[in-house]
């Protein structure tokens, strides 16, 4: 059995711990991500219902509203997000979900672009809101293709800096090969936060 640090004594692979370590390494090497404080980002995995390459691979959920506001108007009602807390009681500002095995069955490059795509949604102010672009499509700008090209550039720059080879080795494995090598895939599972009325 491998000495991979994400494998527990009971021979299960901690996927969410691994994903956090990949993001930690990316933030350390890419100055565009320096604003992200990972201790206030929660990582979770969701079992994808169908084993297909189509569909959602990952999502980033902001825990606050526009501008970092603690509440906002939705369908005429003022709502807030049911809060998540870290183990030391700090407010979680973002929730990163990866859909397994769909995410795991992407190529290494596709995994990197997907992770960076979600991290880039985090506001430069790191205030619990999304990065907002001008225009109607404020989430991905007016050109989602340009957004994805930028993520590919980030991925290539990260790889060019020779990051931890064990991270790259695991990223190169699909779900079947990952389980064959390291054991059952486990991790934190956090439900999507609820919107609740203020007051």
Regions found by a protein language model. Name each.
Residues 2-92, 96-97, 125-199:
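Metalloprotease/metallohydrolase-associated module, dominated by Zn2+-dependent proteases
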Residues 50, 103-105, 121:
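Generic "edge-of-domain/loop-turn" microfeature
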Residues 97-114:
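Short pre-active-site segment immediately N-terminal to the catalytic Zn-binding motif
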Residues 107-111, 118, 139, 143, ...:
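Short, well-structured alpha-helical patches and their helix-loop capping segments
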Residues 110-116, 130-134:
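"Short basic amphipathic alpha-helical interaction patches in structured regions
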Residues 113-125:
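Active-site recognition of the HExxH zinc-binding catalytic motif
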């Amino acid at each position: 059995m491998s000495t991979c640090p994400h494998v527990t004594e009971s021979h299960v692979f901690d996927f969410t711990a691994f994903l956090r370590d990949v993001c930690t390494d990316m933030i350390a090497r890419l100055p565009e991500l320096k604003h992200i404080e990972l201790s206030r980002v929660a990582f979770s995995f969701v079992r994808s219902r169908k084993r297909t390459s189509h569909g959602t691979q990952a999502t980033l959920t902001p825990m606050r509203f526009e501008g970092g506001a603690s509440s906002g108007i939705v369908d005429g009602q003022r709502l807030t997000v049911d809060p998540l807390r870290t183990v030391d009681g700090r407010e979680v500002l973002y929730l990163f979900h990866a859909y397994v095995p769909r995410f795991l069955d992407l190529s290494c490059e596709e995994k990197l672009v997907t992770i960076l795509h979600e991290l880039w949604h985090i506001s430069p102010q790191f205030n619990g809101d999304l990065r907002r672009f001008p225009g109607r499509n404020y989430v991905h700008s007016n050109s989602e293709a340009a957004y994805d090209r930028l993520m590919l550039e980030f991925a290539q720059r990260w790889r060019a800096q020779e990051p931890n080879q064990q991270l790259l080795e695991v990223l190169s494995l699909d779900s079947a090969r990952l389980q064959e090598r390291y054991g059952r895939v486990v991790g934190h599972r956090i439900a999507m936060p609820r919107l609740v009325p203020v007051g």
